[in-house]
Swiss-Prot record:
Organism, as annotated: Homo sapiens
Record's disease association: CEBALID syndrome: An autosomal dominant developmental disorder characterized by global developmental delay, intellectual disability with severe expressive language delay, craniofacial dysmorphism, and structural brain abnormalities. Most patients have an atypical form of rhombencephalosynapsis, a distinctive brain malformation characterized by partial or complete loss of the cerebellar vermis with fusion of the cerebellar hemispheres. A chromosomal aberration involving MN1 may be a cause of acute myeloid leukemia (AML). Translocation t(12;22)(p13;q11) with ETV6.
Biased composition (Pro residues): 338-366, 498-514
Protein name according to UniProt: Transcriptional activator MN1
GO cellular component: nucleus
GO biological process, one term: intramembranous ossification
Residues modified to N-acetylmethionine: M1
Composition skew (Low complexity), residue ranges: 202-214, 291-309, 523-550, 564-578, 759-768, 798-809, 895-905, 973-984
Length: 1320
């Protein structure tokens, strides 16, 4: 937006990336404001990704995940810097800003935040620097008075506002600015999301930043960029994802510089407390003091940033700010506390007084509020987030914006923070990411260690009223319920690590929900409390730390809101169920927070669309919701963040989350820390099984929340998320058990996936992408992947949402999955419709993806979202989510094993590539036996592919694909496709692109990517595909797989397309296969495993089914000698042969990857099929299967899917298990690919085959992997997988099972991801 433009220079100054990101964000952000920012991960990350890329590929994941294992540091850090800064500016202009971005960014963020940040510029700009810049540039200058700002700002810069603002926010600020300093620059991105965590930190006073997270980061931040702290704790895992992207560059570059400058300031910031004098000195600032605390810090930050970009920023923002001032008033209205107005002209008056007060924690309530503990919160309310959502929002819903800001920010911040802590925004979101910000934020409050305490203020969240929210939410909502509820467990880990924040986040999540209702009262309370809170806030800051967690919860809640909102849109009932259980919903949101962070941005975007719906669901939050839609986007970015964060953060921690236990770090979060995962799982569970659905909102959003999760996760897919959530939401009922059970799977999927992705922290990049996906799906897969599971569940939805924000098509996918039970046909129809819708919307996704390309990670997230979306459908969707995660796994690993993800894509491209292929796919798919489905898959896929090409398009397509694949029997194909597509698109595109190759990454994201894929293998593949397609629906799938495998190997981006294509065909294949699968499922797996998997092994297994088809196809593809394998399966055989051609033909090197990809796809397909079978049978099962698929793909996810399916059916289990083993092996193979070539692959395959046939024997599977060169690791994974699969199988339906699976998945995922990373 204007801010953006303005910001851009600044950004440029700060960082080209930032600018890019910024404007991306602006565009995105501005667009959806949150969509992008929130979606940042998705959108900006794309653009930003470049910068982010540098920072962390998965901006989505907060690529910065990588710093944290995945997200947190990267994310949070980045986020902290970027996000935090963003959050800062987005958050509440000053608080967060200075907190995160002591410097320019901050300031502008701040100002906008405070000033009008939210009002107009911030809304759009808030997230965007543009807005923020505006806001805060103006805020600084325009804020109360530009001169003060300028001068103060300058002062700040000179004085190092941090100090200045240090005094302002003596306690908070210092921390805060420390954080702020660190974060300051980053604000540029869309703080909104991140603002949350950052906000929290900022808000909280950066202590948060400063605090544990902050502190850890602090050094890091200081070290890192200074922003790190903020970033980190911004943990924009989610938001960062989005803004984080923005900020990433900022952080990375701009921010770093700013950081450098800002950081210095921040250094001063903490030290800056001394700078207090500055504050005084900055009387002008002082005027901004209230602001200044934010503003000053901002100023200082801004100055720093602005120092660098001061002119631009300032002038830019000056004008903007001025506007913001106007906005500010609006904000002021909105948040009297906000003190934006205060900042605005009033501030001048207040300022001096305020200044002293500012310096004193108890400045005038308004000021203080804003400034002090609460101020952070206050600012937060006033933060652009509120505005960010939109000036109107701000205006119209001062409260809302405030609330939303609060929610969002808290979410973001929390999420970021938490996520960050969890490292997985998911972030983990479950992220991308994402945001466990909700949790983070909330959690952060709780997490003292999270010195997010300072951030807590960010909990402005609670105080729509402004600070009150801080107090209210923080105190009332968060602290009490959230904090206590989840915090406890979360906090335990929290203090120690970011991870703990993860738990915090999650734990907070559920409580957040409580607060949700509180929200409204809260608002009132907030106002009352605002003052109270100001005082309280300081207290609360600690509390706020807790609250931050709570805030995260709030964020989650918000995310969930966002998710729910979307779900609500789609599935109001579920939404409500999801939503309000708010609590749970919040949990979901929380989950969503993380995921929402990512998703939330989307959500916000979506929220914008869905805002109203969201509102409905979240009545109280509604204010936020409706208006916060944008905010949601923000928060959802938190979900996205969650995803990203979750994906990223969660991916790590969240990833760890489920297997928090698995992951030591997450373990603390473990229960809670699973933040996403755990929280998903735990918070999900923690909130109570009852909440589980809601909490499972993470689950819900996860499974039952598949949709929810999807939504959450769809942060990146954010859009899809809501849809998915909605769609999934419906499944929740279906999924109710399934959701619960499946959902758990989902949580697993999300968590597990995240975990897997998490496991891919190493695969961070990939994990970012893969992890993101992995976060949700890939967790380990990549930053994106972690979220993918998160997303994945809603990926489709998410994708859809992304693509078709409101498309609903995605919803359909979810619905489809919901239909899952219905006939395949129904699913197919739905899938078809979905696909179509996706087709329509995919462009959106595409755009995002395009943006995301750089943001591949984000894209992954989105892909994940797709996966999520796919996963959204419990079975199919979820599974696709699972698949996607698997892809992410491969994707993440693909990062490690780019080919895995990538291959996915390419194969699709061929199918898709042939424009007709799509049709053919359709036809094939139809032919496949699932005409409806295949068509859906095909059509969807085609669309999806395109989408995938875009990268985010993938979500739509992915979604479609996933939708179709997961949804329908085709879904399985799609699933594989999705997995591959997701993996490829997400993994391939995102991961492939991100992981596979930056270039491919982008390429993958872009059409070129799939074009490339096609070009790679696709060129050939299309024929294959055509043949395969023509040959058989199964073939279609297989060929795609093969193609995709081939392509994947060939190229990262290629796989994207291929994946799509693959998805299409596989969908059909699976579709067709699905029926057979059901019938011949048992056979399929064996054959798939034996013959399919081991192309050479031949069709003996004769799992001619789609699964086998896929398997065969995959094996064929990768086995090269697939011919023999697919003979077993007619369709498969055909596919296989072509695949074989593709696969075998591809270089051995590619071969392994290709195989992997093929396998993954195959597995996905199989899963899909298994799922499908169950899908028809049980949505839940499918969902779980989907998770399993994801897991399997991740190595774990698939297994999980298998398990779920297994429970459902031994065949499924076997298939899944085998697949998983296969997957693992394949995966590893790709990793091994280098290590092991085609021969190894074959060899591995053979063992696989054995394992697959013996899939029942976990050992066998295990052994099989062991056989692999990489087998050992895969074996482990497999083993775990298998075991878990068994577990899951036994308990697949049960949530416990899911958790187990999730843990397993996480563990495996982690391991797997790690392994992959290692291999890679």
């Amino acid at each position: 937006m204007f801010g953006l433009d303005q910001f851009e220079p600044q950004v440029n100054s700060r960082n080209a990336g930032q600018g890019e990101r910024n404007f991306n964000e602006t565009g995105l952000s501005m667009n959806t404001h949150f969509k992008a920012p929130a979606f940042h991960t998705g959108g900006p990350p794309g653009p930003v990704d470049p910068a982010m890329s540098a920072l962390g590929e998965p901006p989505i994941l907060g690529m910065n995940m990588e710093p944290y294992g995945f997200h947190a540091r990267g994310h949070s850090e980045l986020h902290a810097g970027g996000l935090q800064a963003q959050p800062v500016h987005g958050f509440f202009g000053g608080q967060q800003p200075h907190h995160g971005h002591p410097g320019s960014h901050h300031p502008h963020q701040h100002h906008p935040h405070f000033g009008g940040n939210f009002g107009g510029p911030d809304p759009g700009a808030s997230c965007l620097h543009g807005g923020r810049l505006l806001g805060y540039g103006g805020a600084a200058g325009g804020l109360g008075s530009q001169p003060p700002f300028a001068e103060g700002y300058e002062h700040m810069a000179e004085s190092q506002g941090p100090e200045s603002f240090g005094p302002q926010r003596p306690g908070n600020l210092p921390d805060f600015h420390s954080s702020g300093a660190s974060s300051h620059a980053v604000p540029a991105p869309c703080l909104p999301l991140d603002q949350s965590p950052n906000r929290a930190a900022s808000f909280h006073g950066l202590p948060s930043s400063s605090g544990s997270d902050s502190h850890s980061l602090e050094p890091r931040r200081v070290t890192n960029q200074g922003a790190v702290d903020s970033l980190e704790y911004n943990y924009p895992g989610e938001a960062p994802s989005g803004h984080f992207d923005m900020f990433s560059p900022s952080d990375s570059e701009g921010q770093l510089p700013h950081y450098a400058a800002g950081r210095q300031v921040p250094g001063g910031a903490f030290p800056g407390a001394s700078a207090m004098p500055r504050a005084a000195g900055m009387v002008g600032l002082s005027k901004m003091h209230a602001q200044p605390p934010q503003q000053q810090p901002q100023q200082q930050q801004q100055p720093q940033q602005q120092q660098q970009q001061h002119g631009v920023f300032f002038e830019r923002f000056s004008g903007a700010r001025k506007m913001p001032v106007g906005l500010e008033p609006s904000v002021g209205s909105r948040h009297p506390l906000m003190q934006p107005p205060q900042q605005a002209p009033p501030p001048p008056q207040q300022q001096p007084p305020q200044q002293p007060p500012q310096q004193q924690p108890p400045p005038p309530p308004g000021l203080l509020v804003r400034q002090n503990s609460c101020p952070p919160a206050l600012p937060r309310p006033q933060q652009g987030e509120a505005g960010t959502p939109s000036g109107g929002l701000q205006d119209g819903g001062p409260m809302l914006p405030s609330q939303h800001a609060q929610f969002e920010y808290p979410i973001h911040r929390l999420e970021n923070r938490s996520m960050h802590p969890y490292s997985e925004p998911v972030f983990s979101m479950q992220h991308p990411p994402p945001q466990q910000a909700p949790n983070q934020r909330l959690q952060h409050f709780d997490a003292p260690p999270y010195m997010n305490v300072a951030k807590r203020p960010r909990f402005d969240f609670p105080g729509s009223a402004g600070v009150d929210r801080c107090a209210s939410w923080n105190g009332s909502m968060h602290n009490g319920a959230l904090d206590n509820h989840l915090s406890p467990s979360a906090y335990p880990g929290l203090p120690g690590e970011f991870t703990p924040p993860v738990p915090d986040s999650f734990p907070s999540g559920p409580p957040l929900q409580h607060p949700a209702p509180d929200h409204q009262s809260l608002q009132q309370q907030q106002q009352q409390q605002q003052q109270q809170q100001q005082q309280q806030q300081q207290q609360q800051q600690q509390q706020q730390q807790q609250q931050q967690q709570q805030r995260q919860n709030a964020a989650l809640m918000i995310k969930q809101m966002a998710s729910r909102n979307q779900q609500q849109r789609l599935r109001q009932p579920n939404l409500a169920q999801l939503g309000h259980p708010g609590d749970v919903g919040q949990g979901g949101l929380v989950h969503g927070g993380p995921v929402g962070g990512l998703a939330q941005p989307n959500f916000e975007r979506e929220g914008g669309s869905t805002g109203a719906g969201r509102l409905g669901t979240f009545e109280q939050q509604a204010p936020h919701l409706a208006q916060e839609s944008a905010w949601f986007s923000g928060p959802h970015p938190p979900p996205g963040d969650l995803l990203p964060r979750r994906m990223g953060g969660s991916g790590l921690p969240a990833d760890c989350g489920p297997h928090d236990p698995s992951l030591a770090p997450p373990p603390p979060p473990g229960g809670s820390g699973v933040l996403f995962r755990g929280p998903l799982q735990e918070p999900m569970r923690m909130p109570g099984e009852g909440h589980v659905p809601a909490l499972p909102s993470p689950g819900l959003q996860f499974g039952g929340s598949l949709g929810g999760l999807g939504q959450l996760q769809s942060p990146g897919a954010g859009v899809g998320l809501p849809s998915a959530a909605s769609e999934r939401r419906p499944p929740p009922p279906d999924f109710a058990t399934s959701a619960l059970g499946g959902q758990p799977g989902f949580p697993f999927g999300a968590a597990g996936r995240q975990s897997t992705p998490h496991s891919g922290p190493g695969v961070n990049s990939p994990p970012s992408a893969g992890g993101g996906g992995g976060s949700s799906g890939g967790g380990g897969g990549g930053g994106a992947y972690p979220p993918q599971p998160d997303f994945q569940p809603s990926q489709r939805t998410s994708a859809s949402k992304l693509g078709a924000l409101s498309l609903g098509s995605f919803n359909k996918p979810s619905s489809k999955d919901n239909l899952f039970g219905q006939s395949c046909l129904a699913a197919l129809s739905t899938a078809c419709q979905n696909m179509i819708a996706s087709l329509g919307a995919p462009n959106l996704n595409v755009t995002f993806n395009k943006k995301n390309p750089p943001e591949g990670k984000r894209k992954l997230s989105q892909n994940e979202t797709d996966g999520a979306a796919v996963a959204g459908n419990p079975g199919s969707d979820y599974f696709p989510g699972g698949t996607a995660p698997g892809a992410p796994g491969p994707g993440g690993p693909s990062g490690t094993s780019s080919s895995g993800s990538k291959a996915s894509g390419p194969p699709n491209p061929p199918a898709q590539g042939d424009g007709t292929s799509l049709s053919p796919n359709y036809t094939l798919e139809s032919t496949s036996g699932n005409d409806g489905k295949p068509v859906s898959g095909g059509g969807g896929r085609g669309r999806g592919r395109r989408k995938r090409d875009s990268g985010h398009v993938s979500p739509g397509t992915f979604f479609d694909k996933y939708s179709a694949a997961p949804d329908s029997g085709g879904a399985p194909g799609v699933s594989p496709g999705q997995q591959q597509a997701s993996g490829a698109a997400v993994g391939g595109s995102s991961a492939g692109e991100t992981r596979g190759a930056p270039t491919p990454h982008e390429k993958a994201l872009t059409s070129p990517s799939w074009g490339k894929g096609a070009e790679l293998l696709l060129g050939d593949q299309p024929d294959l595909i055509g043949s395969l397609d023509g040959g058989a629906k199964s073939d279609s799938s297989s060929p795609n797989v093969g193609e995709f495998a081939s392509d994947e190997v060939s190229t990262s981006y290629a796989n994207e397309d291929e994946v799509s294509s693959s998805s299409d065909n596989p969908q059909a294949l699976v579709k067709a296969s699905r029926s057979p699968l059901v019938t011949g499922s048992p056979k399929l797996p064996p054959r798939g495993v034996g013959a399919g998997e081991h192309g050479p092994k031949a069709p003996p297994p004769a799992l001619g089914l789609g699964i086998m088809s896929n398997s065969t196809s995959t094996p064929d593809s990768y086995g090269g000698g697939g011919g023999p394998g697919h003979p077993g399966t007619p369709g498969l055989e055909q596919v296989r042969t072509p695949t074989s051609s593709s696969g075998a033909p591809p270089p051995d090197e590619i071969h392994p990857l290709e195989i992997l990809q093929a396998q993954i796809q195959l597995q996905r397909q199989q899963f899909s099929i298994s799922e499908d079978q169950p899908l028809g049978l049980k949505g839940g099962k499918k969902g779980e299967c989907a998770v399993g698929a994801s897991g399997a793909q991740n190595g774990d996810s698939e297994l999980g899917s298998c398990c779920s399916e297994a429970v459902k059916s031994a065949m499924s289990t076997i298939d899944l298990d085998s697949l998983m083993a296969e997957h693992s092996a394949a995966w590893y193979m790709p990793a091994d690919k280098a290590l092991v070539d085609s021969a190894d692959d074959d060899k591995t395959l053979a063992p696989w085959e054995k394992a697959k046939p013996q899939n029942p024997n976990s050992k066998e599977a295990h052994d099989l992997p062991a056989n692999k060169a990489s087998a050992s690791q895969p074996g482990s994974h497999l083993q775990c997988l298998s075991v878990h699969c068994t577990d899951d199988v036994g308990d697949a339906k049960a949530r416990a099972s899911v958790p187990t699976w999730r843990s397993l998945h996480s563990d495996i995922s982690n391991r797997f991801g790690t392994f992959v990373a290692a291999l890679t």
